[in-house]
A protein has these predicted regions:
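N-terminal "arm"/small-domain region of PLP-dependent enzymes with the aminotransferase-like
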Residues: 1-43, 58, 136
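PLP-dependent aminotransferase class I/II
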Residues: 23-25, 193-269, 275
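Conserved N-terminal alpha-helix of the aminotransferase class I/II PLP-enzyme fold
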Residues: 30, 34-72, 260-262
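Conserved beta-loop-alpha segment that forms the PLP phosphate-binding cup at the N-terminus of a helix
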Residues: 49-50, 64-88, 210-212
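PLP-dependent aminotransferase-like
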Residues: 83-142
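Conserved PLP-binding catalytic core of the aspartate aminotransferase-like
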Residues: 119, 257, 267-300, 316
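Active-site phosphate-binding strand-loop segment of PLP-dependent enzymes
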Residues: 119-174, 178
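PLP-dependent enzyme catalytic core of the Aspartate aminotransferase-like
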Residues: 156, 296-299, 305, 310-337
């Protein structure tokens, strides 16, 4: 059965979809406008995305021939599942993890095997490997840092997984890695079976244009099988302009990380909720009184991500938004103590 993916509300203070809270800088935005005004909109886009891939290759320090781009990293993940997982083959992932994996597996009539993590998202890598071997899985895919928990494994642990499953594709979904520490990019040269997927939706604040990347040695053999003209000229142009200013985003990323740590340090000892350490642009938590907490956020017109169990996820916003979140969390804690 295909599991649907729910889109999100678009009004109030939106801290539910892990978007950047601030729009593109005005100077960069003007550069984008100028670049778009020179496009030949009557012509099809460059299906090779040559300039975009060159810029991203420089940032990632990989050959541009190892890069493929599409409409968000979701499309790249879906393409890999479609290509490698024939009907009844098994994808091995974590639980909880990004719901789109279930969606694409369902479309492909494949199977999915989920390894249950601890409440904070951590898991025993050796047991994960052993279980995957026993189940004879056909593909490894999970987000790192994890969505929704924010937990991240180390490069050493990623290497162990890549080595253990070197005969099948191993895909690390690094949508949030700009806010983390250790990437799998450095494993690509050693492990041809490894792919890394990235996005411009989070750290670069370009969720509205849908631009994501797949990186790996085997990209070249997959390129001709990917949908032509996947990225419009407008998307390529906007993404290219922003990537030329990649260094300017480092300060924004550092601020988000600083705010994340500030918020976590304040709430980590709270008794009425449990918040977990994060390597992403959000905090993940649980509370047995979650319904009351959600109601308190709703009163302040703040939308956070609600899950079916006792858990929730809060995107790191602007400093002002974060202070509003902390105010709600403080009042929730003290009112129930």
């Amino acid at each position: 059965m295909v599991q649907g993916y729910k889109t999100h509300v678009q009004s109030g203070i939106l801290l539910n979809a892990n978007e950047a809270s601030q729009n593109v800088d005005e100077a960069i935005k003007q550069e984008i406008i100028d670049a778009i005004s020179n496009l030949s909109l009557n012509r099809y886009p460059d299906t090779t995305c040559q300039e975009l891939h060159r810029l991203y290759a420089d940032i990632m320090n990989v050959p541009s021939s190892w890069i493929l781009s599409g409409n968000g990293s979701d499309q790249m993940l879906g393409f890999l599942i479609q290509y490698y997982l024939r009907e009844n083959k098994t994808l091995y992932t974590l639980s909880p993890d990004f719901s789109m994996y279930d969606y694409y597996v369902g479309l492909n009539h494949s199977k999915i095997e989920k390894y249950e993590t601890n409440l904070d998202g951590s898991f025993d890598v050796d047991v994960f490997i052993s279980n995957g071997k026993d189940k004879k899985v056909d593909m490894i895919l999970f987000s790192n840092p994890n969505n929704p928990t924010g937990h991240a494994i180390t490069k050493c642990e990623m290497k162990k997984i890549s080595e253990a499953f070197k005969d099948i594709p191993v895909i690390f979904d690094e949508a949030y890695m700009e806010f983390g520490k250790e990437s799998a990019i450095g494993l690509l040269k050693e492990y041809p079976n490894v792919f890394v997927c990235r996005t411009l939706s989070k750290a670069y604040g370009l969720a509205g244009i849908r631009c994501g990347f797949m990186l790996g040695q085997q990209v070249e053999k997959l390129r001709d099988l990917f949908i032509p003209y996947a990225l419009s000229s407008v998307t390529q142009t906007i993404a290219s302009v922003v990537l030329k200013h990649a260094d300017a985003y480092k300060e924004n990323i550092a601020t988000i990380i600083s705010e994340r740590e500030r918020m976590y340090q304040e709430v980590k000892e709270f008794k009425q909720l449990t918040m977990y350490p994060s390597n992403a642009n959000f905090l993940f938590g649980r509370s047995e009184k979650k319904d009351l907490l959600l109601e308190m956020f709703k009163e302040k017109n703040i939308t956070i991500r609600n899950y079916e169990d006792a858990s929730f996820r809060i995107t790191i916003g602007t400093k002002e938004e974060n202070e509003m979140v902390l105010d709600v969390l403080r009042r929730f804690e003290y009112a129930n103590s």
